[in-house]
Amino acid sequence: MKYASNNIRNILIAGHAGSGKTTLTEALVYFSGAAERMGRVEDGTTISDFDPEEAKRKASLSASVVPVEYEGIKYNLIDAPGLFDFEAGEYEGIRAAESVLVCVSGRSGVTVGAEKAFQLARKNGKATMVFVSKCDLENANYFKILEDMKIKFGATVCPCVVPAKLDDGTPVYINLFSQKAFKYEGGKQVQVDLPDIGHRFQGLIEAMSEAIAETDDELMEKFFGGEAFTTEEIVEGMRKGVKDGLITPVFCGSAVNQQALDMLLYNMHKLLPSPEHNSVLAEDANGEPVELTCAESEPAAAYVFKTVADPFVGKLSYLRVVSGKLTAGASLVNARTGETEKMGKPLTVLGKKQTEAESIGAGDIGAVAKLVSAKTGDTLCDASRVVKLPAPVFPKPSLFMAVTVAKKGDEGKISSALARLMEEDPTLSYLNNAETHQQIIGGLGEQHLDVVKAKLKNKFGVEIGLEAPRIAYRESIRKACQKQGRHKKQTGGHGQFGDVVINFEPCDGEQVVFEEKVFGGSVPKNFFPAVEKGVRLAAEKGVLAGYPVVGLKATLLDGSYHPVDSSEMAFIMAAKLAYKAAMPEAGPVILEPIHTLKAHVPNDNTGDIMGDVTKRRGRVLGMEPDEDGLQTIIAEVPLAELANFTTFIRQTTQGRGWFTTEFARYEILPEMLVPAVVEQARKLGNLDESADD
C-alpha cells in the first residue's frame, strides 16, 4: 500500500544502550499485527537486530528501518544503536526523520545516551517525544525520572501519560488528555476507575494546560480565564508545541507486556509532524539555496542516509525521498559526482526483509540495490533540477590500531574488504602507513573495531589481528660536526674515487637542506648532485634507532677527485661515509610526534582530564567553552601516550566527552625513554650494520 506524505511519520528511536529501543520497535510491529510473534533481544530474534553480530552481542550495531502500518498511518521507525561505539546509526537515521523518540528506561532513568539523543534532536531541529519504558517493573520510578528529565532536557518536558497502580498492584496508565485510566490484558486496553495519585494529578493537568496555552495567544487567554481546553484544543496545541520545539511530550508503558502502546502510536500520529509540510533546504548546481517541497509532482530528489555492503548481494542504499518519487529504471544524477545512476526496482524494507514496490513516494523511505557511485550522504536527483542536500558530519575515529594478517596472502584482500565496510560505516577509516609499513584502521572504540574484525572474517573470509600502531619517530642532531668521507676502491681497470668534506649542523624545519661552499675545483660541479643524493640517502636512517633524520643542514666544503676513477656513485658513497662519521659526534637525538589534543568534556570532568593529560607527559594550553555546553581542553600530548585515551575519556565522562587530535610537530624524546625506543627499533630490524656502528 502506498501512503500519502501526510500519513507518514519518519521517527528515529534513540537512547542509551539497554533502554528498550529495540524491544519497543519489536513491540510496535507485533502490536500492529505485522508479526505473529514478538522477538526478543536476549534470543537474537528481533526484526531490527538481524545482523549476526547483533544477535551474538544482543545489541544494535547499526540503524535499522522498521515500518509499522497501523490504522492508515505508516510509521517508518529507525531503530538506532545506543552503544557509543556505534553512534553513526543515530547520525544516519536523524537525517531521514522528522522526529526523534527518546527511549528512557523506567529502571535506570535518564542516562547519558538519552541526553545525547535529545541534544542531537534539538541540534538538528527535530520534533522530540519521550517514551519511558519498563514502567510495570517494581523498581521503576517514573516521577523521579520525570523530575530528572526536567533538569536535563529543560522546561519543554510535558507528561501526557503517567503510570499508577491499582490496589492489587495491577499497573494502569492515566491519559492526561482524556483524564481516563486504562489497564491492559493481553495487550488490550481496558478502562478502569481513575486511581488516586494525590496532589500530583491536578499539578500534572495544570502543567500540561500551561504548556499548551503558551503555543497560542487565544489558548493563553482561555487558560488565564480559567476555562478548560477541549480535547481538540489540547491535541492541536500540543502538536504545534511539539513542531515548534516548545513541548517534549512524555509517554510511558511497557513494551514487553504490550502496555500503553496504543496511546503511544495514536499520539505519534497526532502530535509528530508528517513530511508533508516539512520543506527541506538544499543547494542547486550554483551553490544557491533552493527549497524542496514534499510533493510527488516535483522533480525527484532522494537522500542516501545509509548503505549496507554485502559481498554476495552487493550494495543496498537506503533512501529518504525528499520530493518526487523513485521508480524502477529512472535515471538520477548523483549531485556529488555528477554521474548518472539508473534505479533498480525500489524496495521497501522491514529489518532484513526486502519487498519490491512500484515506487517510493515523497516523504517515504525505501531502498535501491546495486547503485554504482552512491554513498551515504549523497543526493540523487532528477537531471532537470540538480540539487545537493547537506551531508552529515559524522564523529571522527579516535582509536587507531594496526592490522596483522592471520593468513599469508590475505594482505591484498584486506584493503578491498575494508573499503566495502567503509561504505556502510562512515566512522571507520583505513590507511596504509608507508613509513611504518602498517595498515591502520580507525574507529570509535574497542567494541567498534572488534565488530569490524568479526565482519571481515564472517563477511569476507579475512582473518586479522589488531595491535598498537608503531610510532613514526624521527632523528636529528643538536650540534655541528665536520667530517671527511673518502671512498677509494681499486678492483682492476677503472677504480672508484670520491673525497668530500661536509659540515653537518642543525637547522629549523623538518627537512634535510644541502648547500655547497666549494672554492676552486676540488670537487667538480657535476658531482654536486651526487654528493647531495648521498647525504639524502644516508639521512633516511639515523644512527640511534634507524629513523629518518630531519632538521639537518649539510654543507659541502671541500674534497678531491680523480680524473679517471671519480664517478657519481663514488661521490654518493663518500657523502654517506662523511655522514656516518659525523652523526655520532653531532649530538644525535630521537624526536617524537606531538599532537594537539582537543578534549570536549563536561565541566565536572575537566580536572580529571587535565590531570590525566599531565600524566601522559602532556601540556595543557588552555580551556574554552564549546557550543554544546561542554568545556574544550586544549593540550599538546606525545602521540605515544594517547594509545588508550579513547577508553579513558569515555569512562571518565560516562560517554559525554569526545576528542580530536592533530599532528603539531616533533620534539626531542626524553632521555630516559630513548633506550626503549632503540630496543624496539632493533626488534623491528630498523638498525642495520651501518646504523649500529
Where are these regions (language model features)?
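Structural and coupling elements of P-loop NTPases
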Residues: M1-D693
